[in-house]
Amino acid sequence: MSYSVNTFTDYVLLFGSSSLVGKGILENLLDINLYIKNVSDLQGKLDSLSEIKGNVVLNKHVFCVNRRCINEEKSFMKTIDYINMRSVTWQGGRYYLRSRKEKDTEKVPSSPNTFCYDNFEEGFIKNTPEERGKDGYSFVYNQKQFSYTLHYACGKEKGIEIICNFTVTQLIIPRSETWPKLLPRIFSGTQKLEKFDIDNKNYVPGRSLPSLCDISTMVCSLGSTSARVRRTQVPSSFADYYLPFNLAQEFTNTTNKRLVVTTAFNNDFLSKTFEYFRIKAKLENDLDEALPNKLKELVILRPGPMCGQHGNPINVELGKENSTFLEKIFYYPHYLLVYKKKYISEARRIGLRTKLSEIIASSIYRMPGSALLGYAVPVSKVSYVASLMAIERKSKEAGPKLEVISSYQIDMIV
């Protein structure tokens, strides 16, 4: 596929998009408002253009790798926030985002070469004939695509039209221990998606996945929970250390790589006393020192106890629809009983320790002296800052860059 000089394509690898933090990261990376409020990425691309002929096209691809399918029917389309947007500059002029023209809100007809509003496809990926002799693989994927048209104006005469195409591809690989070795094979530059053709009821070759060399940013929010460790009998060190480190090892096949990783608040006492914090400290150190190929940029987020809800929301209706106030009063004891049962069931599913940490984090957030237990921070802020670091303009420094963001800094950034 050939691109014009006004086309820019960015790829992001996201691991842990089913986690509490990862869900928010995925939402943010696919939110147009993240890019129009934080314009360093867009500004950098405009600065590289000496002239603009036609539209400027931004292709944003996010690849999620999960053990099971999530959010396959969810819409990521957002309403553009014209109030809180930031202006951009180009060749001495300052351009402001204007309301979208009516004709641009029309749905684009589906075609193989066009990104569409909320277009959805699914299929499978299998090893190519060129890989004969290697272990075979075959797994399913799903993909959503949607677009926005942004109109930036400088006075009445000058204008820049920017088309933002978002694509999120979810690769469902049940055995997470195989992810590191599969990474360079899947992202070889020749691997094609086999999408399902609804009209002919069969699978046909689709787009090729990019080469791992062309993916410059990886975001990792992998981690263990007590309930998962108990259920799977897999040591917590696998998700907290070995899997993130091995993925980073395969990811750093070139020198221009950025990794954004979420760990945990830490200090010398914690890392020497508790295994969880010791493992997190080892991961941070080894990502910085032990990778065969150094990362150009390593961003470490160290959140404290996070205010947020793991698992699914608990919804119990208080009485039937159109019930009277008196009927609701009589129903209230039954409502409490049902809610209690669902709450206990959900707490057991995600782990009592995890549920307890949620309660503690919410109760100590910004309370005096609470930093002694680790500075609590809303999970939404952790997700936002991780997304922000992933889209920041690449550093121009020659040497490796390490940035550590504390829980307090996360709270203050947003």
UniProtKB/Swiss-Prot annotation:
InterPro entries linked to this entry: Him1/Fmp52
Disulfide bridge positions per record: none
Keyword DNA damage: yes
Taxonomic superkingdom: Eukaryota
GO biological process terms held by the UniProt record: DNA repair
Keywords: DNA damage, DNA repair
Function: May participate in the control of processing of mutational intermediates appearing during error-prone bypass of DNA damage.
Record protein name field: Protein HIM1
Organism this protein belongs to: Saccharomyces cerevisiae (strain ATCC 204508 / S288c) (Baker's yeast)
Gene: HIM1
